[in-house]
């Protein structure tokens, strides 16, 4: 179990497919980064109630273990900070390796910063939205 949410409630959960592999036969890191961005955005929306964000930074990305075809990968997210216009989210990535002795392995983690925008992509304040405090 991780420190973000219960095992049954990741922001997203994906089974990795052969189309996502790199030249070494493991899942391409860029695919994982894309899902980290998606999971973080889901959390930003859930924690603030604001529906439109853009990613401005992906920080402290650390790849601990490779991800393999067939792994069921869970992306757990937690809001770290809600500012006037931005939200900082921590995403932890765990892979469930079927047919292995290991149940769930922490494979990656990252911190992502989003900025709230309007329909014209102008920065807007989050004030007045619901702020989930944990």
PLM feature segments, named:
Residues 2-6, 10-12, 68-69, 80-134:
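HotDog/MaoC-like acyl-thioester-processing domains
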Residues 1-57, 115-134:
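Hot-dog-fold acyl-thioester-processing enzymes
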Residues 42-81:
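A contiguous binding-surface segment within folded domains or other stable secondary-structure elements
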Residues 31, 57, 62, 76-78, ...:
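Residues located in well-ordered beta-strands
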């Amino acid at each position: 179990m991780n420190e973000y949410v219960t095992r049954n409630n990741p922001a997203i959960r994906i089974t990795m497919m052969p189309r996502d592999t790199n030249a070494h036969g493991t899942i391409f890191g860029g695919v994982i980064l894309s899902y980290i961005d998606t999971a973080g955005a889901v959390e930003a929306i859930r924690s603030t109630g604001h529906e439109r964000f853009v990613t401005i930074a992906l920080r402290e990305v650390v790849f601990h273990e490779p991800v393999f075809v067939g792994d069921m990968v869970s992306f757990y997210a937690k809001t770290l900070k809600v500012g006037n216009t931005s939200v900082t989210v921590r995403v932890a990535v765990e892979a469930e390796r079927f047919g292995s002795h290991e149940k769930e392995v922490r494979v990656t983690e990252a911190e992502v910063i989003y900025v709230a925008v309007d329909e014209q992509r102008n920065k807007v304040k989050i004030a007045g939205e619901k702020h989930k405090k944990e």
